[in-house]
């Protein structure tokens, strides 16, 4: 209907925009939730994950600077593949130290980092995996 490619089921698609209108998009989401009690987007299951991929060769001991930084970018991948490979989510790729050197373009895994996992973001990730991943946290 909209001229976008979908998966084989026809239910899922992704749209790329080379810009982000947060000032407009955020207001629409807030007003929709407040006035209509409706979300502008609500996942029904854990289908996909955005994982950290190296922008350049990184050395052991380097600290990742997260989204918008100089060390990693986010790559969308199926949740099952992300969980089974223990890929590092892009949202958790800030202020973590590499325990091994990683070549440009490689997905960073949990085995590649040393991170303080007591922060709330890490705890929320663990709860999400326990709730939405068959068999719980991987």
PLM regions: where:
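C-terminal catalytic/substrate-binding lobe primarily of soluble NAD(P)-dependent oxidoreductases
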Residues: 1-137
């Amino acid at each position: 209907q909209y001229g976008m490619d979908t998966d084989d089921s026809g239910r899922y698609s992704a749209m790329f925009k080379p810009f982000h209108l947060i000032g407009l998009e955020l207001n629409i989401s807030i007003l929709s939730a407040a006035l209509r009690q409706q979300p502008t987007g609500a996942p029904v299951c854990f289908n996909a994950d955005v994982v950290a991929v190296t922008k350049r060769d990184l050395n052991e001991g380097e600290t990742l600077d997260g989204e918008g930084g100089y060390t990693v970018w986010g790559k969308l991948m199926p949740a099952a593949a992300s969980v089974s490979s223990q890929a590092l989510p892009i949202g958790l790729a800030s202020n973590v130290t590499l325990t091994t050197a990683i070549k440009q373009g490689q997905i960073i895994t949990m085995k590649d980092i040393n991170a303080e996992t007591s922060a709330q973001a890490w705890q929320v990730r663990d709860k999400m995996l326990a709730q939405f991943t068959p068999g719980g946290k991987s």
